[in-house]
């Protein structure tokens, strides 16, 4: 997982939102876990998301859908 990869978020309310990882994985000081920064195209916001959640196949609401080269 690295900058440029595409993330999809599917909330319980339906729909899907696409985000682009803007920073490679690193320790996020607030969470004290490995996280990536994501730019969400629908509203122009940035969030940090835990890498372990994105890669967990049981967490279907947030997933890596395309890896950049």
List the predicted regions and their residue ranges.
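Short coil-to-beta transition motif at edge beta-strands of beta-rich domains
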Residues: 1-12, 20
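A short, compositionally biased
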Residues: 2-3, 30-35
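Hydrophobic aliphatic residue packing
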Residues: 7, 21, 34-38
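Short linear proline/tyrosine/threonine-rich motifs used for host-factor recruitment
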Residues: 7, 18, 48-50
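Glycine-centered tight beta-turn/hairpin loop motif at sheet-sheet or coil-to-beta transitions
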Residues: 12-14, 43
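Short beta-strand-centered aromatic/proline hotspots
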Residues: 15-28
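Intrinsically disordered, low-complexity, charged/polar segments
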Residues: 33, 38-69
């Amino acid at each position: 997982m690295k900058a440029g990869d595409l993330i999809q978020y599917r909330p319980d309310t339906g729909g899907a939102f696409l985000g682009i990882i803007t920073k490679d994985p690193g320790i996020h000081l607030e969470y004290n876990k490995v996280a990536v920064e994501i730019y969400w195209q629908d509203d122009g916001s940035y969030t940090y998301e835990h890498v372990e959640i994105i890669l967990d196949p049981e967490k279907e609401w947030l997933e890596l859908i395309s890896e950049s080269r």
